[in-house]
UniProtKB/Swiss-Prot annotation:
Residues 78-113 are annotated as: Disordered. GO terms for biological process: translation. The keyword Ribonucleoprotein applies. PROSITE patterns: RIBOSOMAL_L36E. This is Large ribosomal subunit protein eL36z. The gene is RPL36A. Keywords: Ribonucleoprotein, Ribosomal protein. Pfam families: Ribosomal_L36e (PF01158). The keyword RNA-binding does not apply. Signal peptide: none annotated.
Length: 113
């Protein structure tokens, strides 16, 4: 929604009404719904580092390695329940794979030295 136009002081027209200064209100708590906090992101990252991946996540990464994106999506959908969650999981796993490849290349270069 756009911000309403300034009132004109007239009692007719689109912007009719008494002229007042709008109060600046603090943001409501539910306006941040769906946004993960820095702490939550840190904790999830830490848990992922310690616990590793679930078996179905490992299978998805294996399917993505051989280029079977559609099969990976189907596996994720069956495990997670909805198409939207499955797509998000597939993207997450492919980004993990990309990071592993980029780090793997750097690690291989260090081993050669």
């Amino acid at each position: 929604m756009t911000t309403p136009a300034v009132k004109t002081g007239l009692f007719v027209g689109l912007n009719k009404g008494h002229v007042v200064t709008r109060r600046e209100l603090a943001p409501r708590p539910n306006s941040r719904k769906g946004k993960t906090s820095k702490r939550t992101i840190f904790i999830r990252k830490l848990i992922r580092e310690v616990a590793g991946m679930a078996p179905y996540e490992k299978r998805i990464t294996e399917l993505l390695k051989v280029g079977k994106d559609k099969r990976a999506l189907k596996v994720a959908k069956r495990k997670l329940g909805t198409h939207k969650r499955a797509k998000r999981k597939r993207e997450e796993m492919s980004s993990v794979l990309r990071k592993m490849r980029s780090l793997g290349g750097a690690a291989a270069a260090e081993k050669k030295m």
